[in-house]
Amino acid sequence: MLRKIVEQKKGEVAILRQGTSLQQMLTEMKALPATRGFVNALTTSPRKVSLIAEVKKASPSKGIIRANFDPVAIAGSYQEAGVDAISVLTDETFFQGELRYLQMIKELVPQPLLRKDFTIDEYQIAQSRVSGADAILLIAAILDSEQIKHFYQMAVEIGLDVLIEVHDQTELEQVMSAVEPMLLGINNRDLRTFTTNLDTSVDLLKLIPSGIPVVSESGLATAEDVHLVGMAGARSILVGEQFMRQQDVVQAVRELMQDQHMKPQVNSRGDTI
């Protein structure tokens, strides 16, 4: 599936390059206001574990997750619930997202926005900036070390924060040798098999230097799950499906985050990899 997604993205980027050029976007972004600090919102949150809530209609493994899907209304509910940041799925083919959701949501809420997509080309990074994103996702499983380094540097240069996602120790070592990440994500879902296991976060957190904030992603369904990854050292979590399946999104957020109202505690983690 991952290979299929990447091939689809290559085709999409090739078509996009025939329209607006990369240089046009780089020129256009000079007039844009500064981005909202995505990493800062997560690391300065009063919660012990901060929350990135995701706007997500569907996925390849689960199909339609939220039938009555209104991205702006969902973002409004997230704002009401007091989430720290919002992730917006923009992949159309596999997740039924749209790029325009970023600007639609940005006009409504003050939270910083992560563009959640499969970034394989610098064109997508510039496109993210002019489309309203404050941060982008880089997935180690689909990038080599040079791509990680180049894409990371480009994103930072144009004002975007970067969440780099890993799933195992090999990917973690690859990322750490390429860049000094401002924010690491541990995906508890194996993108090759779509199975989830929270032990992925617990185990990998032991290998990550304590100065790097970490986001635990996928498979978090209860307050106990949040407590588990928080005690292991995660500074933040990313949750989408759990909220999208609930009729009352605000209540769903509050139930999941009910134990997270205290100031952050220092968790001991390994300082070497």
PLM-predicted stretches and their roles:
Residues 204-207, 245-273:
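C-terminal helical cap(s) of enzyme catalytic domains, especially alpha/beta-barrels
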Residues 120-131, 169-179, 220-239:
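Catalytic cores of alpha/beta
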